[in-house]
Amino acid sequence: LHLPHNSGLESVVPSDPDLYTRTDGAMFDEQGNLWVLNTGRNIDNIRILTPQGEWKSFHITSRGTRIPFHTPGEIVVDRRNTQWKWIPLCRENTGLILLKDNGTPTNGNDDSSLFRNEWFDQNGNQIIPEFIYSLAQDHDNTIWVGTSRGLFTIPATVDFFESNSCERLVILRNDGTNLGDYLLEKEQINCIVVDGANRKWIGTAASGAFLIDIVKDEDGGKDVETIAHFTMENSLLPSDNVLSIAIQESTGEVFFGTSEGLVSYMSDAVEPAEDFNNLYIYPNPVYPNYKGQLVVKGLV
């Protein structure tokens, strides 16, 4: 058990260190280091516990200024480069940090990092999120940001250090006007999870859960397809306030954590297999005169 008196963690209340020690976003990197965001009013540190049991700490700066992060969310490791870490700041100084640790996570002196709290979408509209509740990266390396009023994406082609460009997905009204509305623009987005087919499961605070897919047309545009929308009325969701979503990658089972309990749904997308060492075929053997179904598992 790691506490302020026996670790590198700091308490929000120095006079009574065992009273309140806040940690967020714990995760292990590929080197076996445990990353912890140790936060509070006057504590803005990243703490790292090495495999050798040593605690290291450093602050994050952006353009020479130390960035306070009193209420950070999870740390999302970039799929393109594990040295890149995305850290959303949920409330109080709301924004998004990209940290590049240069492969030396216990040495903050050679890092580069940037904090942004303002973006402009494809139509030139300014976005300054009041709250950021969720962050995810899909298989195309697009960053999805869920806020208190809708969501936006940062395409993989955008250099976060050089540009504050983003995109907001548009749902066409199909009423002959060629007009559309931003996807879930009035919803609080509590969570975003990407499944094995690169579809997005989105949990909202008041409208249940959505499963959407992005289909690229011949002109390079993006069409948003709503595959499913689960609510209390049409499913077994115990509440329309979906706080968290998790997927069992090997089976595709989707778990919904709501304000009134937990429920799961068996979806049809699993993560691709790295090899074919665990193939399951039934029936086996298959004889030439067999006319029934053939089941093969382990290809994806």
Language-model-detected regions and their locations in the chain:
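Surface-exposed loop and turn segments in beta-propeller and other repeat-based domains
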Residues: 1-19, 56-68, 106-128, 160-185, ...
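Signature of short aromatic-glycine-proline-rich micro-motifs recurring in repeat-based ectodomains
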Residues: 12-28, 68-76, 126-135, 182-192, ...
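Residue-level detector of Asp-centered blade-edge/turn motifs that repeat once per structural unit
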Residues: 28-31, 77-82, 137-140, 194-198, ...
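Short loop/turn segments immediately following the C-termini of beta-strands
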Residues: 31, 39-41, 46, 80, ...
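Conserved beta-propeller blade signature
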Residues: 33-37, 84-88, 142-145, 152, ...
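Short loop/turn segments immediately following beta-strands, especially the blade-tip
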Residues: 51-55, 99-110, 155-169, 213-222, ...
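Blade-level signature of beta-propeller repeat domains, shared across WD40, Kelch, NHL, RCC1
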Residues: 240-274
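Glycine-centered coil/turn sites that cap beta-strands in beta-rich domains
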Residues: 275-300
